């Protein structure tokens, strides 16, 4: 089975580290990039065809995670989106963008495993 390329986009390095550690246990997902801003993520997405993007809803950038999802939804071969959020306030908008899931911090490891399965 070919591995799915993952990009981690979160403002907090500890959340990126937790995601990276959780994904080490998943044989078919390989983390190929990390970013802390939408701009960095877009640069990486221009060069690597990521299959999945784990992203913060609350980016300290020109756009938030939902707006970035809207931009990406217009791209050919857009990655699947898994939102990581501090609250449920943007969940409806995330699912309107056909997000795979909307996970709350602190991350529930069981829920995370169900999302990836």
Task: Describe the predicted segments one by one.
Residues 1-3, 78:
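A structure-centric signal for secondary-structure junctions around beta-strands
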Residues 33-36, 104-105:
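Short loop/edge segments at beta-strand edges and connector loops
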Residues 25, 42-117:
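CheY-like receiver
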Residues 7-17, 64-73:
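Amphipathic repeat-derived elements
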Residues 4-5, 11-33:
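Two-component/phosphorelay signaling modules centered on CheY-like receiver
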């Amino acid at each position: 089975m070919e591995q799915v390329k993952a990009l981690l986009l979160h403002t907090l390095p500890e959340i990126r580290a937790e995601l990276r550690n959780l994904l080490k246990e998943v044989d078919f997902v390989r983390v190929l990039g990390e970013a802390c801003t939408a701009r960095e993520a877009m640069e990486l997405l221009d060069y690597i065809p990521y299959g999945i993007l784990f992203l913060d809803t609350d980016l300290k950038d020109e756009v938030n995670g939902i707006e970035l999802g809207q931009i990406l939804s217009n791209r050919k071969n857009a990655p699947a989106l898994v939102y990581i959020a501090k609250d449920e306030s943007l969940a409806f908008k995330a699912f309107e963008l056909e997000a795979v899931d909307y996970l709350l911090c602190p991350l529930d490891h069981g829920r995370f495993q169900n999302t990836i399965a």
